[in-house]
């Protein structure tokens, strides 16, 4: 239930939140800064909250309260229309919801280990609800009805808060105090640092798509309903990959998955810049199963293999903080500037980041 509700909310947030910001009058550069701010706050908040989760084991009440506060934050945002108030309230709201996913991922990964379950099969239900949200959102918000977006986020965050109460506490698996100093060698090892850099490069190559894909597609004549279909096709490809790879999760190594993701990203971004027809975009969106899905499964496989269970929330948090915090936080303002200056041609720049990751992974392999 957690994955179902959480990814339903972010099936609204990811494609349509920039649309709401655009329609209330923010420029692409300002939108880039607002989106980046939501990632920057991870750097400060996420490690602290993860440490609390590891040392107390009270993941249930902690995550429920944070998601409830996030709902309040979005309700406040509904009355704002200028950049600085929106930016500041976004920072506060993001401080509440950003730490939740890595904490819950660590709990679910540990549960999957104990119960001999496949993470990919569990995670795909989040992708299913993401598709429902993007398709339904495209229809609901079409024709200038973007004012509805924020209230769907408020209600959705509230439902996620309730679902957090259904997840077992970390203490029910094995409650152990974090020993960060003991595991400093792991987090500072060349392999772990290399993992963060290569996965980070793949991740930030999505910046123009995540921040401005909806705006770009609308600017070239596609309706919100069709744009919702574009996003849904990408996540449907994720589901297929999670299902297929999930059957062989223990046999498929993280290095192969990351190589697959980087190679697909190198091809995907320049082709999105070149082709703008509905059919072409639908076909190219199927590559999302590789550029995101394979990268995500590869990252989770690496963390499951190399990070001890007693600091799993901290390990997950460190990954999300650096990849989704520092990397994305630095990249999104640049993506806003690139999109403002280059429009769809900004995708060519994204391919360069994926190419650097691919070359590095090939050297390692």
Q: What residue ranges belong to the model's regions?
A:
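Helix-loop boundary and gating motifs at the non-cytosolic
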Residues: 1-39, 192-230
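Helix-to-loop junctions at the C-terminal end of transmembrane segments
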Residues: 44-58, 141-142, 240-253, 339
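Structural signature of the two symmetry-related core transmembrane helices
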Residues: 61-75, 154, 256-271
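Helix-loop junctions at membrane interfaces in 12-TM secondary transporters
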Residues: 77-90, 273-284
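Cytoplasmic helix-loop-helix junction between adjacent transmembrane helices
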Residues: 91-125
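Symmetry-related core transmembrane helices of the 12-TM Major Facilitator Superfamily/SLC fold
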Residues: 148-166, 346-364
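Juxtamembrane intracellular "pre-TM" segments in multi-pass secondary transporters
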Residues: 167-199
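A late C-terminal transmembrane helix in Major Facilitator Superfamily
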Residues: 313-342
